[in-house]
Amino acid sequence: MSQAAATLREALNGVVLSQSQAVEVFAAITNGEFNEIEIAAFLGALHARGEDPAEIAAAAQAFRVAAVNFPYPKGQGGLVDVVGTGGDRAGTINISTASALVAASLGVKVAKHGNRAVSSRSGAADLVETLGIPLDLSPQASVQLLESTGFCFLFAQKYHPAMRYVAPVRAALKNPTVFNLIGPLVNPAPLSAQVLGVGNPALLDDMASALASANLDHALVVHGSGLDEIALHGPTQVRELRGAEITAYELTPAQLGLGTYTVADLVGGDASVNAQLIRAVFDGAGQAAHRDAIAASAAAVLYVTGKADTLAQGVQTALEAIANGTVASHLDKIVTQARELSA
């Protein structure tokens, strides 16, 4: 019996694994060392007692190591992602992805990592593709797009081939596992900042602790009154990370300089509908609720990357870029260059 197999047996007996032990087991999973029954038993045992932050961080670490290389110089820095865990079942427009495009138009380098929809009607990949940005760019082409436009989309299926070992298990279990949590933590790009939304407020501290292991300069973990976004219908619970230091506070729409809306005001549809709604916002003809929700999320990206001193300042900067057409024209540039690189 290998050491990883012995450690897996400990987890099945209810032992909470240290981060190094958990890395050992998850690394073995990425290498195909366990069969589906062993993987299912392990994931079920973790979920039954509750995944420990060290185990969440370990799973993310193992799958980042196993990911396809994204050839962006690690020492160059300045990359950010804005992403949510999903699971809030609210059916909103793709706020995070839209906000990534706003931030890119303002000089931020956004390496957006995402996948197709699983439980929602429109995943980040579905929206990006519908907007006209191809998903088949090579890692080298994605770096080129990032350098020239400040945006690239890293399609999770392309960068995480090791997920093939757990995909059948996840489909068969039909229950949440640690893999529902690590999607936002396994971006293959060398991030220095991140905005991470969680759909379950109970995950705020665990995800903040896991993110603290990623050696980021600045990050926000947010839960907005039932959404994995900054809320405009109620308060948002925030965990702000600067290095390994975590600060907790509450944020209201008024503090952002925005009005309040209902969750129903933010509901979208499938990727085609959401693309139309988001394009309308960028063209100055969209709904105010959509515009303000996107601006709030973009403000968080501007804040963690040092492009805004406060979240409220970031909101105003984002709103101005939307209003004056900067975002719409920049999206056209991204689409054009991405298609050229894909050809």
PLM region spans:
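Short glycine-rich or small-residue beta-strand-to-loop segments that form or flank ligand, phosphate
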Residues: 12, 43-47, 81-86, 301
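Glycine-rich anion-binding loops and their surrounding alpha/beta cores
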Residues: 2-3, 7-10, 17, 62-68, ...
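N-terminal glycine-rich anion-binding loops that anchor highly charged ligand groups
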Residues: 1-3, 9-57, 65-74, 293
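N-terminal small/glycine-rich loop or linker at the start of catalytic domains
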Residues: 2-14, 79-85, 111
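Active-site cofactor/substrate anionic-group-binding motifs, chiefly glycine-
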Residues: 50-114
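A glycine-rich phosphate/pyrophosphate-binding beta-strand-loop-alpha-helix module
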Residues: 43, 93-149
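Short amphipathic alpha-helical face segments that pack within enzyme cores
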Residues: 41, 98-102, 293, 297-300
